[in-house]
Amino acid sequence: MTFSLAIVGRPNVGKSTLFNRLVGKKLALVDDRPGVTRDRREGDARLGDLSFRIVDTAGLEEADAASLEGRMRAQTEAAIGHADAILFMIDARIGLTPTDRAFADLVRKCGKPVILLANKSEGRGGEAGTLEAFALGLGTPLPFSAEHGEGLSDLYDAICDALPEQTRPEPEEDEDADTDFVEEEADDKPRRPIKVTVLGRPNAGKSTLINRLLGEDRLLTGPEAGITRDSISVEVTYAGAKLEVFDTAGLRKRARIEDKLEKLSAADALRAMKFAEVVVLLVDATHPFEEQDLRIADLVAREGRALVIGYNKSDLVARGGLITRLREDVDRLLPQVKGVPIVPVSGLMGHGLDKLVAAISSAHKVWNKRVATNPLNRFLQQVTDNHPPPAVSGRRIKLRYMTQPKARPPSFVLFCSRTDAVPESYIRYLVNGLRETFDLPGVPIRLTLREKGNPYAD
């Protein structure tokens, strides 16, 4: 039986370090300064034979509800409300603070099992703080070190004691029982969610858009630019489509990024792009389509991901011919993803979300598309009849055979003579022909030239 644990505590006590250790990956950003984590992040964790959901949360701070810190606290309280048990963490080196005491009262009132972790307790410096934690009235504190992995066996025992029903081993099934009544497995496997990463400049409205798709304020939003730091994934079902959507930090020009934490956030956003199948580039309609938007789109194309452009905050501008001009600019400046869908949306008002999800589903299908060999070679014959490759130094280039070895993105191999002599302009001509003939808008197309391995070689 699965269960969920929320890691809570004041800022900089080591919550994200523990989260990363339990999920076995460096998913959450970690830095020495307090307040790095803002949104709550979920992951699949393992500890011994236990499998469970773990939630990393923002550090608890006393703050006005309308402030950024107050909104972060509301996200943490929501995580406490959804969890089966709480891992309350303190910094044993520093000892108890008034903030620890205040939020221990909050956790105690939630009525859920609480496991008290005295983190950073390795060495003599942590002993006094561990003993001091008894005063919180949350039970016996566990000496722990998230950084070095000390105390994990004690944590395992504490989880089993706190959640005996959820952690009890499942009874083994008798393989011979009821064999005559076992139904065959269905051929159709459950459909996987489409992995979607939302990228854009700071304050483009990425988190607001995802919250609207979810139908709840799951991600931290506000007027401040640069609120999102970690890349947070959430599962969305909208208009019948299943999506796993990654929210990311806003991407500024590299030359403007000086802060170490912003560099980490940008790297995390680009890593999320590499996990994606479809990338939604969210453009702020109240600002012109800038060079940074083009850079992001070019990165997506070079990474081989399907692209959809969301024209956000479109309710705030008089659209008129804006979309037409944007389409012309994108096709001219980004020929490698010609025909990319451009969808006017409003994350705040909820306008256009059905069209955005439909565009994501369509782009995913195109990205996965395969073309049979016979149609490919009929295409090759037709384009070479209409426009044969130019002769180089008096010698004709022979285009012999084309095949598609892989999709995601559509990738083609052309067997020909003198691959080094084929002009780039002719390769672009072939790629554009493939895109138009086989209906491949908005995805990068890979075309590789080879001289050997042609099964129809002379």
Swiss-Prot record:
Molecular-function annotations in GO = GTP binding
Where do the EngA-type G domain residues begin and end?
3-167, 194-368
For binding GTP 2, which residues are annotated in this chain's numbering? 200-207, 247-251, 312-315
An example Pfam family from this entry, by short name, is MMR_HSR1
**Biased segments, Acidic residues type:** 171-187
Binding site residues for GTP 1: 9-16, 56-60, 119-122
Tell me the segments the record calls region Disordered. 167-189
Biological process (GO), any one: ribosome biogenesis
InterPro entries in the record, alphabetically? Answer: G_ENGA (IPR031166), GTP-bd (IPR006073), GTPase_Der (IPR016484), KH_dom-like (IPR032859), KH_dom-like_a/b (IPR015946), P-loop_NTPase (IPR027417), Small_GTP-bd (IPR005225)
Q: Which superkingdom, per the lineage?
A: Bacteria
The residues covered by the KH-like domain are 369-453
Task: Give the family, as the similarity comment puts it.
Answer: Belongs to the TRAFAC class TrmE-Era-EngA-EngB-Septin-like GTPase superfamily. EngA (Der) GTPase family.
Give the NCBIfam families listed for this entry.
Answer: GTPase_EngA (TIGR03594), small_GTP (TIGR00231)
Q: What does this protein do?
A: GTPase that plays an essential role in the late steps of ribosome biogenesis.
Share what the entry says about its subunit structure, partners included: Associates with the 50S ribosomal subunit.
Q: What is this protein called?
A: GTPase Der
Q: Which organism is it from?
A: Xanthobacter autotrophicus (strain ATCC BAA-1158 / Py2)
